[in-house]
């Protein structure tokens, strides 16, 4: 069963301006160490670095919308991180207030699942998040 859906569209140039203005202060406040490491692996191409951050920013916004909280009510930027499953598919890893919110909205006996789609096409980055609850024994 679907528990929440969120989407976000962001202008990559806007993220570039924020990074230029606030630098590490912004990056430390919003992104997990794993997300920062992923972006820095693309350091040879500045546009790819900024697009990587923009996609993850959009994913966090979309996830917060799917949780029904936005970035408030105990859900903070770094409580949500984009990670890749072994096959490469992206998903969200939640901690802190975001994890607590997910647990509170998941029906007893069900397992929460977060599906994430992220993409970019200069100058836009986009993310969709679907949070669902699977009954026991469902793959």
Curated annotation (Swiss-Prot):
What's this chain's function? Answer: Transfers the 4'-phosphopantetheine moiety from coenzyme A to a Ser of acyl-carrier-protein.
What Gene Ontology terms for biological process does this UniProt record contain? fatty acid biosynthetic process
**Enzyme Commission designation:** 2.7.8.7
One GO location term (cellular component): cytoplasm
Q: Which InterPro entries match?
A: 4-PPantetheinyl_Trfase_dom, 4-PPantetheinyl_Trfase_dom_sf, ACPS, Ppantetheine-prot_Trfase_dom
State where the protein is found: Cytoplasm
Pfam family of this protein, just one? Answer: ACPS
User: What name does this protein carry?
Assistant: Holo-[acyl-carrier-protein] synthase
Q: Does the keyword Mitochondrion apply?
A: no
Q: Does the keyword Magnesium apply?
A: yes
User: Which keywords, in A-to-Z order, does the entry hold?
Assistant: Cytoplasm, Fatty acid biosynthesis, Fatty acid metabolism, Lipid biosynthesis, Lipid metabolism, Magnesium, Metal-binding, Transferase
Where would you say this protein principally sits, based on its record?
cytoplasm
Please tell me where Mg(2+) binds in this chain. 8, 61
Question: Which source organism does the UniProt entry give?
Answer: Rhodopseudomonas palustris (strain BisA53)
Q: Which reaction does it catalyse?
A: apo-[ACP] + CoA = holo-[ACP] + adenosine 3',5'-bisphosphate + H(+)
Named cofactor requirement(s): Mg(2+)
Q: Name one GO molecular function term.
A: magnesium ion binding
Taxonomy, superkingdom: Bacteria
Q: Which family does it belong to?
A: Belongs to the P-Pant transferase superfamily. AcpS family.
């Amino acid at each position: 069963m679907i528990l929440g859906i969120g989407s976000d569209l962001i202008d990559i140039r806007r993220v570039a301006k924020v990074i230029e203005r606030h630098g590490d202060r912004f990056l430390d406040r919003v992104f997990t160490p794993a997300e920062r490491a992923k972006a820095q692996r693309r350091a040879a191409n500045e546009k790819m670095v900024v697009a990587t951050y923009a996609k993850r920013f959009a994913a966090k916004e979309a996830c917060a919308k799917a949780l029904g909280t936005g970035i408030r009510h105990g859900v903070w930027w770094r409580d949500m991180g984009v990670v890749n499953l072994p096959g490469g598919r992206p998903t969200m890893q939640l901690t802190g207030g975001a994890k607590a919110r997910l647990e509170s909205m998941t029906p007893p006996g069900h397992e929460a699942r977060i599906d994430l789609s992220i993409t970019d096409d200069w100058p836009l980055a986009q993310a969709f998040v679907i949070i669902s609850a699977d009954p026991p024994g469902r793959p």
